[in-house]
Amino acid sequence: MKKLHIITAALAVATLSCKKDKTSETITDEMNKSVKEVTTEKPKTILTAENFGLAESQMIFAKYVKDIAAITKTNGVGVFMHKKKAPDPKDKTVVRINFDTQYSVAILDLKEEATLTMPETNGRYQTAWFVTEEHYNPMAINKPGTYKINQQNMGSRYVMLVIRTQVNMTDPEDLAKVSALQDQLQLTQNDRGSYVITNNWDRPEVLKMREKYQKIVREKKITSSMMFGKKGETTLENHNVGVSTGWGGMTSKQAVYPNFQPKNSNPATLTLKDVPVDAFWSITVYDQGGWVNGEKFNINSSFAKPNKNGEYVINFGGDKNVANYLDTFEGWNFILRMYQPTEAYFDGSWKVPELVQE
């Protein structure tokens, strides 16, 4: 059984897209202004390794600004777009989709300082992650409170703020609780500003460079722990690999993702005990294409059931009536997501368990 200890954590654009309701079809003057600003034509900017992260991020930021503008009827800057519905398991838009957290996203113009307020969650995982225009990650916020966000602590005028809130996607009551927590998130600024792309990128050239770095990650086996972080914490090559393979990904201090490739389709078990996380862990089963199948494909530590020894025995396939059962099929594989891993994971004193298979 093949096991990869860390895979890239990607924040795909489609992951955070929200479907427009009928009222969002009405285009306001403010929305028109936003769309016009982010699509203004400028002379083509020469793409280099040094500005590749900027190119990818500016195009993604612009997409979000337009989406947020359409949904919130604002100029798309300085306001949250909340994802509140559980992902559709049949939707084949995002590969290896995350069923553990709901997302709240905002693009910030820090020409003026912003204030972020995160509510008390009573122990529920909620984290704020920042991505700058050059795709660096200046900091994370993991506790309730009020925080000042400015160019000094971000190192960039424009940043994307991504807030993840833990949820049990199968429980309508829990989805409602998370929705209420999302509504308590607050962003305030004297002037929300606007977002204007400072460059006109040649998209085919950007895609060509993206493919180049995607090839490098396969050749050099660069892991996600080497790709993300503050400016100066990664090499330029590793940084660009992260941009191309896992845009918006988190550092290993925030999450790690052991990946399991079972040797066959027989029933199997994975026994977890004392998983070294400050937040929570989860398991999601996928097919070879990265999609979920069946009815039971996700479990996390908030609703998994331990045995009398405090162990969580995850049952893959076999008897559907046992605790912690997950469906399997031809070509199945799974990811163990560990949010906010502790030192025991990194120093090796806690070992990722082996899958026991018939």
Predicted regions, residues:
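Sec-dependent signal peptide recognition
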Residues: 2-9
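C-terminal motif of bacterial Sec signal peptides marking the signal peptidase cleavage site
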Residues: 15-17
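Bacterial signal peptide processing site
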Residues: 19-21
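A compositional/structural signature for long, glycine/proline-rich flexible linkers
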Residues: 26-358
